[in-house]
Amino acid sequence: MALSFFGGGGSASHAKYFDIRLDEDYIVFRGGEQEAASAHLSGKLILCLSEPLSIKHIRLHLTGISRVCWHLPSSSAGGGRKSWRERVFYEKTWRFREPGKGKTEILPAGNYEYPFNIVLEGSMPESVEGLSDTYVTYRFKAEIGRKYAKDIVVRRPLRIIRTLEPSALELSHAMSVENIWPNKIEYSISTPTKAVIFGTSIRVDFKLIPLLKGLKIGQIVSQLIESHDLTLNPEDPDSIRNTYKNTRTIINDEYELDADNALEIIDEAAEGYQFSRFLDLPKTLTRCLQDTDTKGIKIRHKLKFRVQLLNPDGHISELRATLPVSIFISPNLAIDDNNNLVDQTPQTAQRAVDDLAQQAPPLYGEHQFDQLYSELDPAGYRTPGPGSGPGTPFGTLSRNLSAENLASMNALTTTDISASALHSRLSNLHASRHSNPSPSESENQLESRLGVPTDYFGPSSGSNTHSLTSPELSRRPSDEVDHDHVPSGMATPFHPQYAEVETPEPCPKLFHSGPHFSEDVAIPAPQSPQQAHVRSANRSSSYFNPMDLLHHRPGYPGGHGDEEERQLRLMQARARV
């Protein structure tokens, strides 16, 4: 509370205004003492002087005090007995002005602000206020010390609230008790959540299905019970001797079904009664505390139900059930210094409930709000364009380099080429296959245009390195190539195309697979192979040897036995022509 002096003469022994201002009215810890994060406390000490003031010091104290006390009732043997214990568990002091021991200082007239701040650990006890002699409180005390006059003192309470985290199970799990009383009734009593905000209401859902013909439902009583477990010395293992337990009824709701409440169909299977009751919590902490367990003060709540069953034979049975409930203080509902809610309207309470519902994590059934893959922007992804075929390999993964003018392939690295460049090169390759290359173009010029090194094919001379274009089977991997050291695309030699070939007889068409066993037996004796004349850029004429073709075809492993087999198959193919 601010201290203000408006004396007529403005004596030098008085301060015009002295107050403690906090940036936040209360400190909020989310979660238990073992999991809550630290909180920052800051504020200012305000001092206004109309005339100079002589002081010894200006200090600010923050103190945490816990007190546990109970009264035992008096008996015929003697009077009542009181047990109590008070301790200071937290202290912090800020010294703003300290002239020195035994010295004084004169503050000129004016306005003064002294800021202060501190980090409070999340394990600090929360404020417990509402009981007469039992509490946990925090108090600020600011004092201006004077040498020959009374000190100027101002005090201000600090409230620390410990609330639930948005992911706490108490906020998402419903509490229910349901069972069947044989030949009596089937019942279900539930609450939407276990945790309830202080100052709001508790909704209780009832479902009662009579199993005995003629059974009627009588009075239904719902009670909110608060239990107190007080311990003088909680750190002492023998504290069971200094423990006091007490209970009090917070809410007592009595309800009877009207004659208009006829049986209704429940769950499309049975007839019964289904209704809800709302239990309004008190708006002051003096009548209802929050759930807590700190500094020897343990507060718990539970709901107790009693349902009267009027049997057809006239006797009355009673159904009893209990549900646990947890009450916590919400930061959205402010509490004044007298422990009462500042705003007690139903709209404010409903707003606090709605804010809490928005903080809770989404349920599993709400996964349809997740972003779908189809909604992502594909721009920038390395995906071949629409013009590229589904089986088009990347440059570094291709077995054969394209027969197009790609001088940039010499600088090809381990990274794949872009989709647009690949599409452009494939289009140029498709166009180049429809035009015949000039027969006068030399092999060395073609190899240099494609960026193939001259020593790639090994020692060669004249036209002995010429061969026809590899058929589709040339894409098979060669067993003679060490793929661990040869980059992809260079494991198969490149063979240029030659369009004009002079042959006395039609050139046999190479087969893609070996002949059938029956055909091999029916083939007559092989004849000597024919010779074909091939135009060359280096020589006017040369001989085309089928063995050279098989020798340079990629994909056939070397070996003497394999060489004879290939000769036999080629001669058998020529004999069928």
Curated annotation (Swiss-Prot):
User: What keywords are annotated for this sequence in UniProt?
Assistant: Ubl conjugation pathway
Indicate, by first and last residue, each region the UniProt record lists as having compositional bias (Polar residues).
428-447, 460-472, 528-544
- GO biological process terms held by the UniProt record: regulation of protein ubiquitination; ubiquitin-dependent endocytosis
Q: Where is this region: Disordered?
A: 376-398, 428-566
This protein's GO CC annotations? cytosol; plasma membrane
A Pfam family name for this chain? Answer: Arrestin_N
Q: Which GO terms describe its molecular function?
A: protein-macromolecule adaptor activity; ubiquitin protein ligase binding
What segments bear the compositional bias annotation Basic and acidic residues? 473-486
Q: Which InterPro entries match?
A: Arrestin-like_C, Arrestin-like_N, Arrestin_C-like, Arrestin_domain-protein, Ig_E-set
The UniProt entry's sequence similarity note says: Belongs to the arrestin family.
Checking PANTHER family in the record gives: ARRESTIN DOMAIN CONTAINING PROTEIN, FI21816P1
Subunit structure, as described in the record: Interacts with hulA.
Q: What does this protein do, in the record's words?
A: Component of the regulatory network controlling carbon source utilization through ubiquitination and deubiquitination involving creA, creB, creC, creD and acrB. May be involved in signaling by recognizing appropriately phosphorylated substrates via its arrestin domains and then recruit a HECT-type ubiquitin ligase such as hulA, leading to ubiquitination of the substrate, providing a link between ubiquitination and phosphorylation in protein regulation and stability.
Annotated protein name in UniProt: Probable HECT-type ubiquitin ligase-interacting protein creD
